[in-house]
């Protein structure tokens, strides 16, 4: 499985070296500029581009929770980026609205097309490619084995029941949390992603590809009932945003999070002494679904400097830069990349991540099936209902029955 994900040649493609036009400033917004080692990767490769091209890059940092709303508002107001990162979920509505430029010519000129991951197909419409993958790492179970051991748990939980038992033991014996997830309703995307991990993990979803609403599917009721149980019994912290939940994990107070390898990157950067005790494991839900949202690079249709933006994109996708994304950031890059044998020996869990990504992919793009264009509105209705359920203002079954009716009525108006 590792070779399916982490395979490529190591030689640079001579044709990928761009010819730069000089003297412009590129506007490049992202939520990643200040994300620890991820931000360092971007800044290092951007500096290489600036030195080679004579151009400048305006590194516009926008928080992840606000990114979609802010950047769409800016584009509508005429402040159009030259190159930008987008969450995979943003692609369908932006393509549908005509916001993005086709990248096929850029891909051909850059010489990286044969190295792009298969997930590039998500950005293809009517034969045109409107984005290229930035990263496609799966969410799975990030585990603090030391905390589990302190609670008397010697084996990684493989079922939801075992996860619950481990959480009880962690609380009783260490005072920590066995499980944590972002449940700050002011950050709806992260709340929705976590719900996907559970409803897909129980073999269902909020909707189906043909548009059928399945909010009150019995499997969803069971999945959300488990989530509420963790909150009600104090086994998971209440009201935390995803950043605060990750901070608790870094402080050694959380045993398991359903997270991506970016949390491993954060541990390596901020608490390297913890790395020996941290593993990346299969999610202990019935289907083991590894939600894969990822991110893409795009160039807006009205970008002022599309040629220079293509050159910068080509710099980011050069083979050495992609290998460094894998080895330095411990995440799957947007193209195939060959890690060194030394790296794999020191980071055996990366091979496990690759196998999880290949074996249990699900929820590509964080979008409800059948509602890719209307995903934002759909997600918000789900999160509003989860807020009612988690706060105790309604039961799980009543809340999801109400959500079923609400979504069906809304769907009928589309």
Regions found by a protein language model. Name each.
Residues 1-20:
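Gram-negative bacterial Sec-dependent N-terminal signal peptides
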Residues 31, 224-308:
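Extracytoplasmic/periplasmic substrate-binding proteins
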Residues 68-79, 97, 147-148, 165-169, ...:
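Short helices/loops that flank or line small-molecule/ion binding pockets
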Residues 126, 130-134, 139, 164-212:
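Extracytoplasmic/periplasmic solute-binding protein
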Residues 167-168, 173, 210-238, 279:
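Glycine-centered hinge/linker elements that transmit conformational signals in sensory
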Residues 262-274, 286-384, 412-414:
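C-terminal lobe and pocket-closing loops
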């Amino acid at each position: 499985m590792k070779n399916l994900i982490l395979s490529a040649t190591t030689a640079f493609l001579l044709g990928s070296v761009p010819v730069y036009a000089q003297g412009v400033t590129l506007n490049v917004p992202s939520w990643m500029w200040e994300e620890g080692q991820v931000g360092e990767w971007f800044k290092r490769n951007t500096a290489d581009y600036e030195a080679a091209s004579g151009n400048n890059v305006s590194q516009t940092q926008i928080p992840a929770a606000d990114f979609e709303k802010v950047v769409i508002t800016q584009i509508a107001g005429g402040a159009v980026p030259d190159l930008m990162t987008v969450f995979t979920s943003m692609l369908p509505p932006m393509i549908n609205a005509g916001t993005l430029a086709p990248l096929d010519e850029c891909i051909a000129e850059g010489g990286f097309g044969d190295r792009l991951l298969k997930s590039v197909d998500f950005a293809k419409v009517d034969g045109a490619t409107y984005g290229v993958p930035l990263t496609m790492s799966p969410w799975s179970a990030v585990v603090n084995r030391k905390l589990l051991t302190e609670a008397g748990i010697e084996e990684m939980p493989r079922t939801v029941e075992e996860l619950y038992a481990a959480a009880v033991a962690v609380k009783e014996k260490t005072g920590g949390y066995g499980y944590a997830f972002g449940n700050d309703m002011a950050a709806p995307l992260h709340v929705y992603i976590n719900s996907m991990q559970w409803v897909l993990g129980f073999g269902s979803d909020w909707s189906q590809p043909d548009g059928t609403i399945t909010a009150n599917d019995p499997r969803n009721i069971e999945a959300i009932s488990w989530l509420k149980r963790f909150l009600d019994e104090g086994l998971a912290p209440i009201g935390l945003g995803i950043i605060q939940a990750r901070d608790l994990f870094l402080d050694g107070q959380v045993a398991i999070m359903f997270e991506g390898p970016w949390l491993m990157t954060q541990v390596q950067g901020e608490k390297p002494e913890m790395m020996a005790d941290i593993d990346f494991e299969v999610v202990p839900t019935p289907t083991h679904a590894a939600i894969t949202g990822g991110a893409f690079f795009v160039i807006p249709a009205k970008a002022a400097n599309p040629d220079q933006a293509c050159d910068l994109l080509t710099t980011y996708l050069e083979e050495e830069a992609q290998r460094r994304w894998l080895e330095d950031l411990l995440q799957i890059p947007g193209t195939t990349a060959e890690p060194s044998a030394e790296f794999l020996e020191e980071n055996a869990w990366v091979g496990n991540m690759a196998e999880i990504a290949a074996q249990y992919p699900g929820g590509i793009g964080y979008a409800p099936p059948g509602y890719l264009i209307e995903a934002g509105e759909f997600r918000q209705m789900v999160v509003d209902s989860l807020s009612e359920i988690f706060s105790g203002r309604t039961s799980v079954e009543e809340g999801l029955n109400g959500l079923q009716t609400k979504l069906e009525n809304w769907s009928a108006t589309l």
